[in-house]
Amino acid sequence: MVKDWHANTVRFNLSQGALQYEYAHGLSAYADMVRNVIEQARSAGLIVILSMQAERYSCTPYEDGGLQKLPDLRTEQAWKQLLDSRLTHDKGVMLEVFNEPATTRACDDGTFRHPDWKSWAHGCGREPDQGMLTVGRWLRKQAPENVLVFMGDGVDFGFSGFTVPHGMPSNSAYSVHPYQYVVRGNLIDSIHAWNTRFGNLAASGHAVIATEWDEGLKHCPNDPNQTITRYFIQRYLPSHTIGITVYGWDAPVHAPGYIVNSYNYPGNAATYQFVDPNSDGCVHDAGRILQETFRADAVQ
């Protein structure tokens, strides 16, 4: 990762379910393993982003037949299980409060394009200690030195219509997942969407990170020459000082590291290539564009 991609940051999705189970039963095997992996990454010189994940990929049980889509007391218990003095005194470890919150699913509030930011911050009373700001403020007390990362809501888990709420912890950043970065196959429309979802927030002086991104299936036919993709990676993000991590990087097999997305495939075998498999035979390689950009940045 460091040698072939010139990466300086790695993001790990944590299993809220596993950590919470250990918290409730006095166990530590999973938390110990995670700490060991973090130590290896830090020894390699990488900044580490830890993201609390409560989706099915993280072995976290459903609540009321559905996914947990806002952090709550269970999220706090999971963080408490993992955090120790080494992590909370390491400023090279960033804590992403909760992965991909959705108030429409957690609270039946707002819409996908117009999130309810009050519920995002404070929850809707359905669970104890619910809400991104609620849990974020609790997490700040546990980890006063780490950067806290707050993910948005709605399209691209962005920040359309967002106003920073009162009481947001200091030393915080904001994260997005801009998978829907190509809009109607048009660069001007795409730039407008980027501005609305995260660019304006970055331009106002707030730190923004795209903590997941890949080219995805839907964008191959809509960006035939990868004009939008190149502009997004090579010009827009740098001009707004927005960092990016890909989803997801895997270790080398027959070549120096790939972007893979294998959770939709049966068995344990990932399809190793630079972008998601595409039934239309698209040969785009946005991963290579990103890799080249990382290399160029490293030279500078």
Regions found by a protein language model. Give the residues of each.
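N-terminal carbohydrate-binding accessory modules
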Residues: 1-9, 24, 153, 288-299
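Conserved beta-strand edge residues that scaffold enzyme active sites
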Residues: 16, 55-56, 215, 251
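An active-site-proximal structural segment forming one wall of the substrate-binding cleft
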Residues: 1-9, 13-14, 20-97, 127-138
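Extracellular glycoside hydrolase catalytic/binding regions
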Residues: 70-94, 98-251, 256-296
